[in-house]
Amino acid sequence: MEEKIQLKWYEKRQGIKLKDKIKSEQKKKEFLEKQNLKKNSDFEKNSQAQKKIRSLKKSKFVKPLENLFASEKIPEDAKKIIEEFDKVVESTHPLNSKQKLLLPKQIRSLSHFLTDERGERRLGYMNQTVLLSAYVHYYTWWNLVRLVRLFSNIDKKFFDVKDSSVFLDLGPGIFSVPLALFLSRPELRKKHITFYCLDISQQALAFGENIFLSVAARLKCEPWKIVRVKGELGSSVKEKADFVTSANLFNELCDDFKNPPDFLAKKCTEQILSYLKLENENARYIIVEPGDPRSARLVSLMRGSFMRRGFFPVSPCTHFCDCPMDGKKGGKWCNYAFKTDDAPAELKKLSEKSELPKERAVLSFVAFQKSKDGQIDGCNCFSDER
């Protein structure tokens, strides 16, 4: 109910007429109504703008996690090789019945050796035949499951290299990265690539090359030119590389490095840059490590270190800000995972026998490319619910 307008005693003394006051109150009311309408309109416009921004972020800047590990992007011939990888290994390095029987136990022992007994192991453990065999049948196979899935989903422009390009894989062990690249990127199979593989274990290098040649034969492809280099990170390589790769390398180096992780990241960045052909404006490097907090911390630090040297991140996040999930003590770390439901049946069976089943494959990674002017356009962020 509207309050009846009346003159106050002081208004009467001032000579104000009732009709003038009524008119003034009506104008005031109209003004307030207009102000409220404007506020509501501005609020609605702002809400719509925020919705539009969120929509743009989702459609343009944020890719859902399944895009990073879509299995349908894996070439069919690669799927077959991964499914039957145990047969590939058998064709190059067959095991007798007793060795096959002992394999799950040896894999379990190797797992303890790589985790619980970190401080006691030597970096040259791959020179031991039993450990090498266990590593190939379990870790290399799982590495291919992870890496082929990842490489198949990274933007194809990242792998658009010229014919006769030089690649270098650091600490390849059993050629996990060269194998994964050969399987996941059919366009690279057609190119004449010289692939340098650096590792401290000559035995592992020879083992890996035999498997690589066997895979190339099964795919009926001309293999890349493989150059094995026995040595540790920092050892000289004959040619500068257009493309450098590393997987599970720094996770092991951390065990023998007493300095803080930021010092290690800076040192390793300088060593990797020394291998790259820096005059090539499209020089590339990809680092892949296990998705544990310590490895993710190092990957995050390497990301920052490479950006400061004029490289930009191509995947997973292309922004130039500090990583908000940098793995500092007590904080969240950046890692990506996918379910292993469609992993090879024999691999899952072997994992069960070894008491090392995997429900998810997890990794932390960054792909870099040298920018022309140290600048990039756009921002793609992948998110994972952990």
Predicted regions and their residues:
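N-terminal auxiliary segments of SAM/dcSAM-dependent transferases
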Residues: K4-R121
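Conserved SAM-binding loop of SAM-dependent methyltransferases across substrates and taxa
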Residues: I174-R189
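C-terminal lobe and adjacent flexible extensions of AdoMet/dcAdoMet transferase-like proteins
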Residues: P344-R386
